[in-house]
Amino acid sequence: LYTDILKFDSRNPEWDGRDRFILSKGHAGASVYAAIAENGFFDVAELKTHYANGSRLSGHVSHHVPGIDFSTGSLGHGLPVATGRALAAKQNGKLYRSFVVMGDGECNEGSVWEAAEFANHYKLDNLVAIVDHNHMQSLDYCNNTLEVDMAKRWEGFGWNVIEVDGHNHDELRNALNDTSNSEHKPTVVIAHTVKGKGISFMEMDILWHYRFPHDGWEYNCAVNELHKTKPEGVVDPYTPNGCPEKEEKPE
């Protein structure tokens, strides 16, 4: 989004012509903070204050941070707000688009489908939802809570549906660029993802939905495996001297 899709000006975060972006799954705020810091909204060094007492980089995204359009955390609110902003753009003759990233578990919220129906009725082709379809929510797998065919549900609400591998940047980029051909429909990009991707002992394990790795084997193994996914030449500011030595898992 921040490298190829969104229109924004980090020197003027409130620029009226910017595209609007809402991270509805606000608990994933660390990823957005990293992206906007790298794009000049604030100093990258401030990322080290994330979650610290008194830091503006709270666990859920806050509009007090430059580049954040809407505070989120209470699920089910992002799409309704993005829908309202898309309608406002249409009514005011503005060319900006509204983007919202949501979780698949979040799609259990009734407010999501009220907004989806509204967006279809008003032909909001300047609205793009991205659903992180990792099949997990809170403390269980999505299908154990409410089994839904995600693509068919959105199609039933009249949306233009695109499905992609959420770990493939080219597929994501192409899908988001294709939304301009949506025939006066809002677009949803369903990004199929793997929770804990790249870390062998975390992938698709519900245990890790609310856990963080402890010091020692868990942390060192996770960092080592993540480094294997890092593009060559990219420097990690948190481990500038390389990752810790891999350890054997304790018995």
Enumerate the language-model features and the residues they cover.
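Structural motif
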Residues: 22, 97-102, 128-130, 188-192
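Short acidic, glycine/serine/threonine-rich loops at helix termini
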Residues: 33-35, 62, 111-113, 139-143, ...
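Conserved thiamine diphosphate
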Residues: 93-96, 142-175, 227-238
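Histidine/lysine/aspartate-rich catalytic loop segments that bind and position anionic ligands
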Residues: 125-144, 152-154
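Glycine/aspartate-rich loop-and-adjacent alpha/beta segment that forms the canonical ThDP
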Residues: 169-251
